């Protein structure tokens, strides 16, 4: 059985983390996810200018606190902020200070494993949740990885949990089978794991759990919601598309990822 930090056990209804969607995720979506039993998340960099992140974190924490007061028997799930920890992110220090101010329960790190970032998040609860997992409200770090090598590096640097980004995940993703990734990771890691990759139904969530994941990491399905910051035409495209409409390529950004053919055409390019 996985060792799950107490903060992640606050999920009210579903073993689901709503993945942070570039541009699209916003406070309204995060609040809706959390108040309906899903760990909601958004990228810190979606707040533009940087000062807007303070306003957004205030909005989220106040809304969730109000919900919990009004619904003591149905508390909100925790929320998460995604931080790009690569050295190219010149906002990281500023954004991390704001996350510390609001004691963001979960930090999702991407593009590099940073021991200093992990230690800072753990300090919000006053103790490392890796050592004492019963801490009621300590910061937890989940790190997204595309293979077992990076998974080891993330845990060695102090991350608490892993997000294997398997084949089929929206945006930048691995081509590895989720069966292989989960099996390799579970051979040595018993902490929280959230599986990403083509999960958009209750059956897929159950399958992820059967493989050994604690949570399903779902992004694309939340694009087609009222709260998502996307145009209606794109939301409809999400609903109308199927697996044959997905292109896996490194042509557009230099990094392999999954893209919708319709989006590629709308950008004036030929997906074929």
What is the predicted role of each segment?
Residues 87, 168, 198-199, 221:
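Acidic, glycine-rich active-site loops and adjacent beta-strand->loop/helix elements
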């Amino acid at each position: 059985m996985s060792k799950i930090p107490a903060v992640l056990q606050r999920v009210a209804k579903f073993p689901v983390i709503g993945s942070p969607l570039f541009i699209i995720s916003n406070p309204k979506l995060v609040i809706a996810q959390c108040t309906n039993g899903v760990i909601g998340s958004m990228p810190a960099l979606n707040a533009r200018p940087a000062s807007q992140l303070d306003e957004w974190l205030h909005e989220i924490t106040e809304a969730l606190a109000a919900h919990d007061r009004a619904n003591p028997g149905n508390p909100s799930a925790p929320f998460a902020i995604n931080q790009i920890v690569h050295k190219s992110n010149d906002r990281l220090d500023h954004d991390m200070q704001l996350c510390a101010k609001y004691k963001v329960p979960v930090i999702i790190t991407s593009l590099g494993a940073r021991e200093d970032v992990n230690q800072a998040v753990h300090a919000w609860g006053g103790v490392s949740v890796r050592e004492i997992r019963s801490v009621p409200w300590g910061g937890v770090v989940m790190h997204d990885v595309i293979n077992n090598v990076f998974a080891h590096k993330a845990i060695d640097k102090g991350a608490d949990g892993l997000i294997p980004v398997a084949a089929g995940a929206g945006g930048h993703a691995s081509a590895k089978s989720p069966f292989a990734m989960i099996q390799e990771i579970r051979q040595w890691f018993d902490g929280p794991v959230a599986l990403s990759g083509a999960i958009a139904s209750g059956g897929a969530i159950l399958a992820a759990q059967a493989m050994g994941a604690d949570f399903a990491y779902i992004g694309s399905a939340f694009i087609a919601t009222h709260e998502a910051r996307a145009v209606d035409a794109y939301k409809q495209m999400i609903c109308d598309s199927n697996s044959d409409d997905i292109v896996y390529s490194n042509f557009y950004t230099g990094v392999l990822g999954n893209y919708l053919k319709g989006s590629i055409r709308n950008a004036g390019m030929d997906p074929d």
